[in-house]
Structures are given as C-alpha cells and as structure tokens.
Amino acid sequence: MRSRSVTAAVCGLLLVSLPSTAFGEVVRHRDPADDVARAAVGSNVYAPAPDQVRGDIIATKVRFARRAVWIRYRLQDLAPTGNGNFHVIGLRSDRRERTIQLNAFPGHWEGGAVVTNTRAQAVGCLVTHRIDYDRNRIGLRVPRSCLGKATWVRVGIRTTVAGTTYAYVDDARAAGYSASLVYGRRVHREP
C-alpha cells in the first residue's frame, strides 16, 4: 500500500518537472449571441438586428504557441451565399500591430487573406487560414515572426456579411456595434 503512494508521488513530481508543451497560453471568449448590427448597403448607421444569425460570432479561441498565434472563432451561421463575408482580425503585440483582412465572396468562397501594418500597407506575412462552412468556423495561423517575435498579443475580430440590401456586422468582444475593433486581453507566448 505504501509503495503505491510513493509511486504515485514520484509520478506526480515527474509530471510537474516536465517542460511545458508547445501550446502556449490559450484564451477563450464567449460572445453574446444575437448581437449583430445591420446597416443599409452604403450607409454607416448601424442598428441592432437580433434575428440575424449569419455572421454572428459566438466564441473565440486564441493560442500563442512558440512559433505562431492560432486564432479560431465560431459563428452561429456562416454560409457561402450573398455578396460575401468579410473578416477583420486585428493583432496588437509588444512589438508590432497587424491587421488581417480575410475576404470570401462569390467565386472565391475559400477566401483570401491580406496582412497590413498600421499605415495600411501590405506586408509579407504567410498567414494561413481555413473557412469551414459546414462547422461555421474560421481558423488562422499567424507566424510569430509577423509580430516581430512578440511575447504577448491581443486579438480583435469582426465579421461582416454583405447581403443585397443590408450589411450585417458583429464584433467578437462588443455587445452590439462598435465603431472600432475591440481587443481581448493579452495572450502570452509559451516561454
């Protein structure tokens, strides 16, 4: 009986002493459902559209591993219909700021990503993405080098779905419409 306790204690100490995995810090956030806002196409006046589910962000996950920031978010409904869906992902770090524009529209529903700096100039950054319409999810991998080898990052996410008469927008961290992107708390890189 005593040998089992000693064995369990030794195993516990060994597990604690092992180096951490390469997953880094993970931050999850649940966005309130039914907080989409709408504006007539060509207008910048937004009003609540609680019945709109397409483009409604409901959960985000940010993981800062050794070599990359992994971003995944889920929507109530994401479909390859209408005039397109457009996503803005902002990244602020202790080194650099980057904005990723991920646009998917008729004929290009797989989407294309462009990364810009604070002066809205395109920068060479090999961001990879995947839009999964069946699971209503979007995932991105941002190499750490794009952020100047940052030690922490804050992420903001906004989705816009364009219809023929209205555009619907949701910010992952704001309840309702916000004129500027709302960023989450710092996510630290794995040492």
Question: What name fits each language-model region?
Answer:
Residues 115-148:
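Acidic, glycine-rich flexible loop segments
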Residues 1-24:
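Secretory targeting and sorting signals
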Residues 135-177:
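Ser/Thr/Pro-rich, low-complexity mucin-like regions
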Residues 85-94, 155-159:
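Aromatic-rich beta-strand patches that line glycan-recognition/binding surfaces
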Residues 69-71, 87, 138, 155:
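Hydrophobic residues positioned within well-ordered beta-strands of beta-sheet architectures
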Residues 81-85, 150-153:
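A short, polar/proline- and glycine-enriched secondary-structure boundary/capping micro-motif
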